[in-house]
A protein has these predicted regions:
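Catalytic domains of carbohydrate-active enzymes, especially glycoside hydrolases
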Residues: 32-51, 56
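Substrate-binding/catalytic cleft of secreted carbohydrate-active enzymes
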Residues: 47-285, 289, 296
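N-terminal carbohydrate-binding accessory modules
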Residues: 1-40, 61, 193, 286, ...
Length: 299
């Protein structure tokens, strides 16, 4: 289990890619950072996974002072990805618990030696730059096999740079048995319960999509399950929490990460719209399930 201040602590998180409709990777204001963090806290979440991006320093400052935990991704690299492998086949192999070694440089799009060294240099800079933010509790070097390589060496390197924090070595799949967290993504198939001597985390789930036309940037819709009303979205979220997510805690899961904080272009699977004008699910229902999720750790 995760502990915070020597007490068991369930981390109920949200995937946060840090996009805004006017500036994309640039927030419109300092208040925009505060709004996103506070909105997630008000819904009952206590952790944000900053996904595929290093945020402006002010964002981490606000997480520090507002009491929001952070899992920090290293932005992914490598050459063009083989989606049939790192997306479709990987989902099936992950569900079947068939291990895949990170030696397949071509399949994992990491054949370039210069690119691998550049990654090491950049992750060193990231850890050193963000080291003094107490909100950061976990480093995430690789996500879903995107440019993954030498996972154990990279994990050991991060631990040497920063022995005070945890490392989620491979979020999603292609686990190499190293790091502090056994980290899975769940979208389509049954949620596995692997035997592990590491902390078990559901580092992505959900992806439920509802497009509100007057608050969307694109006509296209991307999501793993699509809805046309807030009521239907909320009901399906409740069933997922009741039947799968909350029961997973007694099976050892100690953290969850819902996808995602806000809509992003055609990704209409956010808790709030791209323009931050609408919360798409009933806030009281989301709060209720977050409370049950955290309490289930002690039941």
């Amino acid at each position: 289990r995760f502990f915070l201040n020597d007490q068991p602590y369930f981390q109920s998180g949200v995937l946060d890619q840090g996009y805004w409709p006017d500036g994309l990777y640039t927030a419109p204001s300092d208040e925009a950072f505060i709004y996103d963090i506070r909105a997630m806290k008000d819904l009952g979440f206590n952790m944000l996974r900053k996904h595929g991006k290093i945020e402006a320093d002010r964002w981490y400052f606000h997480c520090d002072r507002m009491g929001m935990l952070v899992w920090q991704d290293m932005p992914n690299g490598g050459s063009s990805y083989h989606h049939w492998f790192v997306t479709y086949l990987a989902t099936l192999l992950n569900w079947m618990r068939i291990p895949v070694k990170d030696l397949h440089a071509r399949l994992l799009s990491r054949t370039d030696e210069f690119g691998r060294q550049e990654y090491i240099d950049d992750i060193r800079d990231m850890v050193r730059t963000l080291y003094n933010h107490p909100s950061i509790v976990t480093w995430v070097p690789f996500n879903e096999g995107w440019g993954q390589f030498s996972t154990k060496k990279v994990t050991d390197f991060i631990h040497r740079l920063d022995p005070s924090r945890l490392v989620d070595s491979a979020s999603g799949w292609f686990d190499q048995g190293c790091g502090d967290i056994n980290s899975l993504h769940y979208y389509f198939l049954g949620l596995p319960v692997p035997e592990s001597d590491r902390v078990l985390a559901l580092s992505e789930f959900g992806g439920y999509s509802l497009r509100l036309p007057e608050h969307s940037a694109c006509r296209n819709i991307y999501g793993y399950k699509k809805f046309t009303t807030s009521e239907a979205l909320t009901d399906s979220f409740s069933r997922l929490m009741e039947n799968t997510i909350v029961p997973s805690v007694k099976n050892g899961y100690s953290a969850t990460v819902f996808k995602q904080l806000s809509d992003i272009e055609e990704e209409t699977n956010g808790l709030i719209t791209y323009d931050r004008k609408k919360i798409k699910m009933n806030p009281l229902i989301v709060q209720k399930w977050n409370t049950k999720l955290k309490k289930s750790l002690h039941s």
